[in-house]
């Protein structure tokens, strides 16, 4: 067999171990909030429904670089305005027409959140190939168990819905590319941290950690959790230059003491 034949044989034997062109980007918004994208060579995922005059050119350029004309999946972790802004959501839906919208499974309590949920439901109902997915405990239970070191995303939470809205944020590991990104929304519960520490996939496959609640010091992110998850890079969604007090000094110290770079 020549080299090409050997490579093809290995790919056929081990399809889950193939290299995948992958890009992750954090967007500056010019104000408080979170906005990211993850591209695995096939699927372009926009994380959070935020779009400003500052971030729009960067998103357009990222789509162009990845040769995409639309967003494949819009993933929203929380109904809070800094994660899902109604007017910005409408522009994203109308301009880049996501095929799939993953949105929080808890009921929004604010007028902005309620308007966003209605807009998503109307958008998905208009065209047959658009799919809206509420990330509820029932939805998570319907998913197949994750395979260790496989190219399939893992949704960890919400396992149950609680009174505290922040702890109903969606927790998802994006791992369809050649590196993996853990998105934590605004979670604060020590119980959710314990869930992650008990998960073999989470403890062995995280490359990039999006800091929960914009890097706030709320008791969730501890040294023990970082020691288990072992991220190579932490990303803080707070625009830039430690604006809005994020990440908090204690969180920055925890990361620095473990050699985890903060972006």
For each feature predicted by the language model, list its residue ranges.
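Stable alpha-helical elements in mature extracytoplasmic
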Residues: 55, 59, 85-88, 116-120, ...
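Active-site metal-binding motif and surrounding structural segment of the metallo-beta-lactamase
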Residues: 53-103, 198-216, 230-234
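Metal-dependent catalytic neighborhoods of phosphoester/phosphodiester hydrolases
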Residues: 81-95, 111-121, 221-224, 247-249
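Active-site environment of divalent metal-dependent phosphoester hydrolases
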Residues: 31-32, 54, 78-84, 107-111, ...
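A cross-family glycoside hydrolase active-site/sugar-binding cleft signature
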Residues: 48, 104, 184, 212, ...
């Amino acid at each position: 067999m020549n080299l090409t034949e050997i490579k093809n044989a290995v790919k056929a034997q081990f399809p889950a171990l193939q290299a995948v062109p992958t890009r992750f980007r954090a967007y500056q918004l010019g104000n408080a909030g979170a906005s990211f994208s993850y591209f695995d060579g096939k699927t372009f995922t926009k994380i959070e429904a935020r779009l400003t005059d500052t971030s729009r050119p960067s998103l357009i350029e990222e789509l162009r670089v990845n040769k995409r004309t639309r967003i494949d999946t819009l993933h929203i972790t929380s109904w809070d305005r800094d994660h899902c802004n109604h007017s910005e959501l409408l522009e994203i839906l109308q301009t880049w027409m996501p095929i799939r919208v993953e949105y929080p499974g808890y009921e929004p309590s604010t007028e902005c959140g309620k308007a966003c949920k209605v807009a998503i439901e109307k958008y998905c109902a208009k065209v047959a190939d658009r799919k809206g997915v509420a990330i509820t405990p029932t939805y998570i239970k319907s998913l197949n168990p994750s395979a260790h070191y496989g190219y399939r995303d893992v949704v960890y939470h919400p396992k149950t819905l609680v009174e505290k809205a922040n702890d109903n944020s969606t927790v998802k590991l994006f791992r369809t590319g050649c590196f993996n990104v853990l998105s934590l929304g605004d979670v604060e519960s020590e119980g959710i941290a314990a869930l992650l520490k008990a998960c073999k996939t989470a403890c062995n496959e995280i490359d990039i950690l999006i800091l929960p609640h914009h890097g706030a010091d709320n008791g969730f992110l501890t040294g023990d959790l970082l020691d288990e998850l072992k991220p190579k890079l932490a990303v803080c969604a707070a625009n830039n230059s430690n604006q809005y007090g994020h990440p908090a000094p204690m969180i920055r110290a925890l990361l620095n003491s473990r050699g985890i770079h903060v972006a």
